[in-house]
């Protein structure tokens, strides 16, 4: 633990941005052939960070509301077949620009927590909310199971 804010322990690592974070996550969490789940479509920079580790990239169905929680549950797997993590951009997703709905965020966080699937929540555009408050992050819904970039 590096700091405590308002009674809640926060774990932080300083870095040069989310691209560097993705590279470090790939080097630590991905082994050759391990499964990594991503939205369809997903951020090209994430795929470029993950690819040198030679994972099996598996797409999770998505629609205008965000990632399909039922498909996430199926593709998460279990035991030796479990995915290493799911990579998500819930705010202004790149390349689609969509924002995951509150209901879908709750469902995705619940599935991830239930099956023990780590979530990589990339939020590079989270400060672009001008006319409304931002939705609650996936990390706020599943703090022990989410790496927040």
Predicted regions mapped to residue ranges:
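Conserved core of the PLP fold type I
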Residues: 1-115, 127-147
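Hydrophobic residues in beta-strands of the RecA-like P-loop NTPase core, especially within AAA+ ATPase
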Residues: 38, 120-121
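Active-site glycine-centered loops adjacent to acidic/histidine catalytic or metal-binding residues
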Residues: 122, 149
């Amino acid at each position: 633990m590096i700091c405590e804010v308002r009674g809640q322990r926060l774990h932080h690592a300083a870095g040069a941005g989310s691209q560097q974070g993705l590279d470090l996550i790939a080097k630590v969490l991905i082994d050759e052939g391990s499964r990594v789940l991503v939205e369809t479509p997903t951020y090209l920079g994430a795929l470029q960070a993950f690819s040198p580790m030679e994972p099996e990239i598996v797409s999770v169905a998505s629609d205008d509301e965000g990632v399909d929680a039922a498909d996430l549950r199926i593709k998460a797997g279990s035991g030796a077949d479990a995915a290493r993590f799911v990579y998500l951009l819930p705010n202004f997703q790149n390349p689609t620009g969509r924002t995951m709905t509150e209901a879908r965020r709750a469902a995705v966080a619940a599935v991830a927590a239930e099956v023990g699937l780590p979530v990589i929540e990339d939020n590079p555009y989270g400060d672009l909310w001008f006319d409304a408050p931002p939705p609650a992050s996936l990390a706020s819904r599943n703090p022990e199971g989410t790496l927040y970039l």
